[in-house]
Amino acid sequence: MATAKDYRNDIRPNWCPGCGHYGVQAAITDAVVAKNIPPEKLAVISGIGCSSRIGGYFYAYGAHTTHGRALPYAQGVKLANQDLEVIAFSGDGDAFAIGMGHTIHAFKRNVNMTYVVMDNHVYGLTKGQASPRSDIGFVTKTTPHGAFESPLSVCETAIAAGATFVAQSYMVNRKELVDLIQQAMDHEGFSFINVFSPCVTYNKRNSYDWFKEHLVALPEGYDPTDRATALKTLGDTDGLVTGLIYQNTSKPSFEKAMAAANGGPHPRPLTEDVVKPDQALFDSLCNGFK
């Protein structure tokens, strides 16, 4: 049986004291422990940003990739070795600015993996610039007179693009977040969770108190399979709602669709098909660069 200690390494997180990302890391650990996923069956892929440091704090397979490109790496890892539980992490800038082209297609493509976005409405690692999630009027180094663009409604965008699992949570509500992560891992297809994770250093506007005042939970009896209701709920709450907002179990995963198109699944993991050159060939290839 896996324990939280199994996922710890010797690297100490260096987020700011009070950063919401500590809560996200704790919830992810709780979820993989509850699912009894051994570290060698977990792959943690991240992009660039404060959020993306999280991959270095897990004892598991992983890759700290390039800015906005966590999803191409993560989807490749999953398709090459479908036995791995793959979780990708980004911040709102990484996911919805430089990486938005990849994010939209991941929503549509439906590879069987989980994507957690740690949303603090600001670029933190580069010391405080407006992100696609920043509120109108938010003053930063890049918006000294206040942001004037409307923030991107990410859950509405995900549903419109064809995502099959769309959830939102607040890192303070650890029990809900752990439950949503487990549901995401159980879902066959691409699971997207947007997690509100306050930045205490560069975003004094969207603080812990602000989220406590503005966030609402989904009502009792809410049906996450109703797409129209999901979109209406997001519109009525200005996107500030938490819970499992939408789930579609009828759309096949990318893996199943690919297998059907190719007359059946690949007989073995793609990782076993890698052609490894012998030493002589490897040396000759290296000599060409000397």
What do these predicted regions represent?
Residues 1-124:
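Thiamine diphosphate
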Residues 10, 199-290:
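Flexible, low-complexity linker and terminal segments
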Residues 17-25, 66, 147, 151, ...:
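Generic structural signal for well-ordered, non-membrane alpha-helical segments
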Residues 41-47, 88-91, 117, 169, ...:
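Beta-strand segments within the central parallel beta-sheet cores of soluble alpha/beta enzyme folds
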Residues 49-51, 93, 197-199, 249-250:
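Short glycine-rich anion-binding loops that position phosphate/pyrophosphate groups of nucleotides
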Residues 52-56, 177-180, 253-256:
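Short, solvent-exposed polar/charged micro-motifs at secondary-structure junctions
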Residues 97-114, 118, 122-242:
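Glycine-rich ThDP/TPP pyrophosphate-binding loop and its adjacent helix/strand module
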